[in-house]
Each structure stands twice: as structure tokens, then as C-alpha cells.
Amino acid sequence: TCALPIYWVIEKCITQNLEWGACGYEMKPISINLTRRQFLDPNLMNVVAGLFTKYNYPPELLEFETTEKIFSENFLQARTAAESLHSLGVTLTLDDFGTSFANMIEITSLCVNTLKLKRAFVQDIDSNLGKQEVVRTIYNLCRRFDLHLIAEGVETNREFNKITGIGIKSIQGFYYSRPLLPVDFEKFIGENHL
């Protein structure tokens, strides 16, 4: 695989969001997945702070996603990185939540704003009572600890109805759309009045 340079990706996302804002679209947070190495990069905070200054970009419109595994493997280093990014105003999300053995107490001590529920919890949830109870428990824990919860990988009406019936309001997946190029995204939000 060919990895894109993460600093370039961050800058491109910032400039694309600013372009949409200049075209009259409401600017929404843009989320970028970071690998373990990228998240723990000691230069990341300075680069991001520099981009915020260069483009006069609101920090709350940038979100970084990383997996909970990073925190279970390198808790102190990951917590320091999370605190640094959080101090800039960046939102942090734990992606694929439920794939590792992260301690909920440790998660509440991090500067994490959002958990993204792994697709495995969503798949076949309409017919699996065990999954429904696990998801309901995670949802209630997130509410208790004031964490935003996103169900990722929602593809069908049945999955959507069961997830939203539990109370989860933020959904990601092919239920809405497959990934889109910026020009197609503009058409999509225009057609759907988003």
C-alpha cells in the first residue's frame, strides 16, 4: 500500500473545508484517521498548530481518529499525545471501539470526546439479542461519561432502525453513501439539503 504523507492530508482537509465554507456550505468537522506512528509523532501538535495559524482554521473543525489499541499498548505516551492535541482544541475519537481491551476507567481519563462502535457490533444487530444488549450497555456508559457515540458501518434499514432505536443518533456507513470525491460530496449535500 502507498501511504499519503499525513501532514499533507491534514492540510488538504483544512483547505477543502475552507473552500466549502467559502462556497456557502456550513463547515462541519473533518475527521482524519491516524495510525499509531502518526498519532504518537512528537511533531504532530506543532504542525497542526501551525496549520491552524496559517489558515485561521477553527480547531473544533478538526477531528483525529485512532484506535483504542494505541492506548492499551502505549497508555502514557498516547495519553500525553491526546492531551497535547486536545489542548489545541482538536476533537479526539477512538475508532473501532470494542476491538481491544481498553479499560473504561482509562478511557474516561483521556481527552477523548467520541467512541466509534465497530461494524462488528452493528452487523446483524436486528437479529442478535446479545449484540443489542452489548450496544445498549456501551451507549449507556457513553451517556454516563459524556462521550459521543457513533455507530460505524451501518448499511441496512434494519441496522439503522435498531441502532437508532437504542438511542444512538450518530451513524456512519453505506446506509447514507459510499465514500465520495469532493465534487460528488457537494452534489450529495446539495441534493439532500444537508
Language model features with spans:
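EAL-family c-di-GMP phosphodiesterase catalytic domain
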Residues: 35-42, 61-76, 88-194
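Catalytic core of bacterial c-di-GMP phosphodiesterases, primarily the EAL and HD-GYP domains
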Residues: 5-77, 153
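Single conserved hydrophobic/aromatic residue that forms the stacking wall/gate
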Residues: 1-2
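Conserved functional hotspot residues or short segments at active or partner-binding sites
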Residues: 81
